[in-house]
Design a protein with these regions (language model features):
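Bacterial N-terminal signal peptides that target proteins for export
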Residues: 2-11
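Bacterial N-terminal signal peptides
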Residues: 10-19
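N-terminal low-complexity segments enriched in Gly/Pro/Tyr/Ser
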Residues: 21-217
Length: 217
């Protein structure tokens, strides 16, 4: 099971790339993927409306960061441990922090989030939501990507998702909105309240919006 989960972040990254392919792109040029996580025997698929609410807190993050979050969400215990590690080593950042964590047996997606302490804290403080996000990421990958695009479209139509100094927003087709850092060397983590930024109220079960700023991304 661990070996299958270790490749989930890579698979999710490929799915994000696939979702961003423009209409008519040659599918043969992209690597074929197969499920990397066995569906839970008693798993009940999450319907679209509930899926939309589940991804709302991260749907407006840059694509590469979304992929890492989805992968890390399948390891909630590791996320909690990584958050505690960061808080215990507040004087460390960047490569130094990564070096200090080398002995930890964490998934690469969790290790990557060491560079984003605010994201780790959000995931650790909302473990119920994080676990639910991990379940759908492992069992309904394509549905998760579709939900992210639906929520981006809502924010875009509401005028709350646009290019700026931190991010570049490109609507490649009616169904595909790509979010990338304006500066490829700096990944900006937007702060927004998912209950209001999408134009209509969105309540995410198990997720607290306390101390989350409401901003146009």
């Amino acid at each position: 099971m661990n070996s299958m989960k270790q490749s989930l972040a890579i698979c999710l990254s490929i799915l994000l790339i696939w979702a961003m392919m423009p209409p008519g792109a040659d599918a043969g040029a992209w690597p074929a993927t197969t499920p990397t996580h066995a569906p839970q025997e008693l798993y009940a698929p999450v319907p679209p409306n509930d899926m939309d609410a589940l991804v709302a807190p991260i749907a407006l993050y840059p694509d590469a960061l979304v992929a890492q979050i989805l992968g890390a969400s399948t390891y909630p215990d590791q996320v909690e441990a990584a958050d505690a590690f960061v808080k215990a080593n507040l004087g460390m950042t960047g490569d130094r922090l990564q070096q200090a964590a080398q002995d930890e047996e964490w998934d690469p997606s969790v290790m990557a989030l060491l560079q984003f302490p605010s994201v780790l804290e959000k995931l650790a403080q909302n473990l119920g939501w994080t676990s639910a996000l991990g379940d759908v990421s492992a069992n309904q990958q394509a549905d998760v990507m579709a939900a992210i695009q639906r929520m981006r479209a809502k924010a875009y139509d509401a005028g709350n998702l646009k290019s700026g100094q931190q991010i570049k927003v490109v609507k490649e087709s009616p169904d595909i909105i790509v979010i990338q850092p304006a500066n490829p060397q700096v990944v900006y983590v937007p702060a927004y309240n998912p209950t209001v930024i999408y134009g209509s109220p969105v309540a995410t079960p198990g997720y607290s919006t306390t101390a989350v700023a409401t901003t146009a991304v």
